[in-house]
Amino acid sequence: MLTERQLLILQTIIDDFIGSAQPVGSRTLAKKDEITFSSATIRNEMADLEELGFIEKTHSSSGRVPSEKGYRFYVDHLLAPQNLPNDEIVQIKDLFAERIFEAEKIAQQSAQILSELTNYTAIVLGPKLSTNKLKNVQIVPLDRQTAVAIIVTDTGHVQSKTITVPESVDLSDLEKMVNILNEKLSGVPMSELHNKIFKEIVTVLRGYVHNYDSAIKILDGTFQVPLSEKIYFGGKANMLSQPEFHDIQKVRSLLTMIDNEAEFYDILRHKQVGIQVKIGRENSSTAMEDCSLISATYSIGEEQVGTIAILGPTRMQYSRVISLLQLFTRQITDGLKK
């Protein structure tokens, strides 16, 4: 069990190192207003913290840096919530106030903004639709040649896309088709829609719409939606701006992993509910042993539908990132309900 003095010194070392990326020595600590102990006391406590495995020496400096054990203790026991600047809160809320109907756009823009706000790499795993059930479908004409097809699921997820309307299909045919779809398909799992449409619905449509072949083309375009999760990245190259990763050889395997994307898909799709923090070698990939990955799940109602994560150095601004993720997951959840 650490003493109050050791807790204060450990927290100050980690806070300072996160901000400066420079090893922290006793002289640096002695200049801090919150540290009122003598230099000798500070050195003794630092020696004890090193012996306990919370901090460690570097080859190029007499100062100390946090170890993985130190970061883990910091995250679990010392971290305090950080209040985000009001302008950032407004920026994030304004994004979701735009009523973005497409889950894909919500995920893409979330990844981009998070990467800009943190200068780390942001990763968003979009919602998986295959287990959702169709609630209703709408086809809203924009002009004579185009319309917006809107699919709403039982979880409140909204998927929209622009489709082409052949000249041979009139508005009355569109209306009949939508009525038939909603009558026959409401409550059907999304993964079964394609099979049900082309085995059952097409036969029904033949007796109601004038231009059957063109109506089938509209159907095919309307229900071509991705059922598996899609992964979106923001700031893939942001790691290169971190002092820890200026050595390109050191970061090569990480950049390859980020560029490949598939491994992150496997990592994120099995995340537990809530905020999860993986530090250094706690991560499953050796390419991430100098990184921390903070992830949070977002949901619609009781159902977890996606994951949003930030990848950065172990010297990460943990409190700020966690606060951002908490705000984003709330906003994404609300955005997908619109």
UniProtKB/Swiss-Prot annotation:
GO molecular function, a single term: DNA binding
Keyword Aminoacyl-tRNA synthetase: no
Coiled coil segments of this chain: none
Keyword annotations: Repressor, Stress response, Transcription, Transcription regulation
Keyword Lyase attached: no
One of the Pfam families matching this protein, by short name: HrcA
GO biological process, alphabetically ordered: negative regulation of DNA-templated transcription
Domain of life per record: Bacteria
InterPro entries, A to Z: GAF-like_dom_sf, HrcA, HrcA_C, WH-like_DNA-bd_sf, WH_DNA-bd_sf, WHTH_transcript_rep_HrcA_IDD
PANTHER family according to UniProt: HEAT-INDUCIBLE TRANSCRIPTION REPRESSOR HRCA
Family: Belongs to the HrcA family.
Function: Negative regulator of class I heat shock genes (grpE-dnaK-dnaJ and groELS operons). Prevents heat-shock induction of these operons.
The protein's name: Heat-inducible transcription repressor HrcA
